[in-house]
């Protein structure tokens, strides 16, 4: 098969690892540290936001470094994969030897830095692999993002699936993640090439490019709804729906639908163009997810249907936007490192923003993680933040995309 000769499955596996690292940080880790160690949601939100501000400086620097790696590139990237694995073990499998909030900050910093460096190099390598062929970028994105979404599915279900099987489900997940990370790094080893251009990219040139700048702004606005819903998902399922224990299966439904839909959106984009297909998917996302506002406690089945429908639409976001940006980088910044440093920055900033704004608002309404006796205003606040805010933000993203001319 052509895909095997091009080693595209290696990209699928590595993308699965990276996405599997991201889900625990944003969805499981805050609740785990709040439930297990009694850490304040406000403190966790503030710390996550502070770490993301650190990323504002870190990601462009890591992109700058990535474009200047030469002979040692393979070794440095592989060592970074070790850091990613060890940081996950530290976060979930080792009891904090210091104050839990500071241990959380230390291990998450290791995860953030390793994740950022690996992601930047991974997506930049995709730019050079696909070249300037528009169909090549969309095709690679389909393999890559399908792997990413499958990785999220596994990361979503394993911790809850291991309850009753493993003494410490999150520790078992962390050790399993570390092993898979090293396997994926082994298969990606031959893919890490030196930079494709002798002249490293200048970040100013990327920002000054009209199309690249518009895509970055669109990514920032469009990623925020998913950041909001991801941050509050566990709390919504447990406290609003009263469906504790269903978190893993529901997450799997959402991301599996996204993974299955990803090649379909990719094929549609090759035929009809990325922009009209993406607009269609975003409109369908609002139509499906908006129904969440009408749910009552016990409505697990209707919510499962919403997870499938909205997950299928998210597959377009996660496949087409990175492909559009990579296609532009192939023209103005062939090395890709600086560009995807910026891309990482805007996407991760939305998660930080969601944490620092939403978690304190939730706590001030009287919400206490794990409590079975919450005041009505806490449930109302949770519902509005989880269901209404993402829908409004998605409408803003749709308006922006419609009004934006992305073609040169």
Predicted segment positions?
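Membrane-embedded alpha-helical bundles of multi-pass transporters/translocases
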Residues: 2-408
């Amino acid at each position: 098969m052509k895909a095997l000769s091009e080693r595209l499955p290696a990209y699928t596996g590595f993308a699965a690892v990276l996405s599997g690292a991201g889900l625990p940080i944003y969805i499981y880790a805050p609740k785990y540290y709040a439930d297990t160690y009694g850490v304040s949601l406000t403190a966790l939100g503030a710390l996550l936001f502070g770490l993301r501000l650190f990323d504002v400086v870190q990601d462009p620097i890591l992109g700058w470094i990535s474009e200047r790696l030469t002979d040692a590139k393979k070794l440095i990237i592989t060592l970074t994969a070790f850091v990613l694995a060890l940081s996950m073990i530290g976060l979930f499998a080792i009891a904090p030897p210091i104050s839990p909030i500071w241990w959380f900050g230390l291990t998450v910093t290791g995860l953030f830095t390793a994740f950022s460096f690996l992601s930047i190099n991974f997506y930049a390598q995709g730019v050079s692999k696909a070249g300037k062929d528009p169909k090549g970028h969309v095709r690679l994105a389909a393999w890559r993002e399908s792997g990413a979404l499958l990785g999220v599915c596994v990361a979503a279900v394993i911790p809850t699936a291991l309850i009753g099987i493993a003494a410490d489900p999150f520790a078992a997940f962390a050790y399993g993640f570390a092993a898979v990370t090293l396997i994926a790094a082994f298969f990606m080893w031959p893919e890490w090439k030196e930079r494709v251009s002798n002249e490293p990219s200048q970040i100013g040139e990327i920002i000054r490019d009209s199309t690249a700048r518009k895509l970055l702004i669109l990514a920032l606005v469009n990623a925020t709804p998913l950041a909001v819903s991801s941050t509050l998902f566990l709390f919504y399922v447990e406290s609003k729906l009263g469906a504790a224990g269903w978190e893993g299966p529901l997450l799997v439904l959402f991301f599996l639908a996204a993974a299955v839909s990803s090649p379909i959106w990719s094929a549609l984009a090759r035929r009809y163009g990325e922009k009209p297909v993406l607009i269609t998917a975003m409109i369908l996302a609002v139509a499906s997810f908006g129904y969440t506002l009408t749910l009552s406690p016990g409505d697990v089945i209707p919510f499962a249907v919403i997870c499938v429908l909205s997950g299928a639409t998210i597959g377009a976001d996660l496949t087409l936007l990175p492909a559009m940006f990579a296609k532009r980088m192939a023209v103005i910044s062939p090395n890709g490192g600086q560009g995807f440093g910026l891309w990482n920055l805007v996407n991760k900033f939305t998660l930080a923003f969601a944490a620092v704004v939403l978690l304190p608002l939730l706590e001030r309404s009287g919400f206490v993680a794990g409590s079975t006796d919450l005041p009505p205003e806490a449930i109302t606040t949770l519902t509005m933040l989880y269901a209404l805010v993402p829908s409004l933000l998605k409408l803003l993203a749709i308006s922006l995309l419609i009004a934006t001319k992305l073609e040169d």
